[in-house]
């Protein structure tokens, strides 16, 4: 929970820009990724965090804002599936830190808001939502973002 809150605080702090934002994101994103690996397998009856979901317009605004805050190095190249390069003609694909961070935020923050509601069933749904979406979505975005942020920090 603490790692999710830290991530949200860094993203929501609009004054963080450029190198300062990159420096704040590195430990925060690494901590969030590590915490996700330890999430318990909780299977609630339902996951009621949908009422806190971000709209596409909200996501798009965050994506654009993060791209501007990161600056000209927001775009990067990566392999979609680094274990099977032949499936993709061995060509890298473009990534964008604004997309990575906005997608992580979209997967994390609604569940955090649900958790803050104090209802145990909502809390269980929040944990399950994080664990599930980590496995198939925001975990990969975290790794791509960390690799790129690391490179930007070490090669400035």
Locations of regions flagged by a protein language model:
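Residue-level signal for secondary-structure boundary elements
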Residues: 12-15, 19, 37, 44, ...
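N-terminal interaction modules that seed assembly of large macromolecular complexes
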Residues: 1-56
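Acidic, proline/glycine-rich low-complexity IDRs
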Residues: 89-95, 102-156
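Charged, amphipathic alpha-helical oligomerization/scaffolding segments
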Residues: 2-6, 24-31, 35, 61, ...
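Long amphipathic alpha-helical segments
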Residues: 41-112
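Short glycine-rich, low-complexity/disordered patches
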Residues: 16-25, 45-48, 77-84, 122-128
């Amino acid at each position: 929970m603490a790692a999710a809150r830290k991530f949200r605080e860094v993203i929501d702090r609009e004054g963080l820009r450029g190198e300062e934002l990159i420096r704040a994101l590195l430990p925060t994103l690494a901590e969030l990724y590590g915490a996700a690996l330890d999430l318990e397998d909780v299977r609630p009856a339902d996951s009621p965090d949908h009422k806190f979901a971000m709209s596409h317009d909200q996501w798009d605004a965050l994506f654009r804002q993060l791209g501007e805050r990161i600056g000209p190095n927001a775009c990067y190249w990566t392999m979609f599936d680094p274990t099977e390069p032949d499936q993709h003609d061995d060509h890298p694909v473009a990534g964008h830190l604004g997309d990575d961070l906005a997608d992580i935020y979209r997967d994390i923050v609604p569940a955090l808001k649900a958790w803050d509601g104090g209802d145990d069933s909502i809390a269980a749904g929040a944990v399950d939502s994080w664990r599930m979406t980590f496995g198939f979505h925001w975990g990969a975005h975290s790794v791509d973002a960390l690799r790129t942020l690391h490179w930007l920090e070490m090669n400035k």
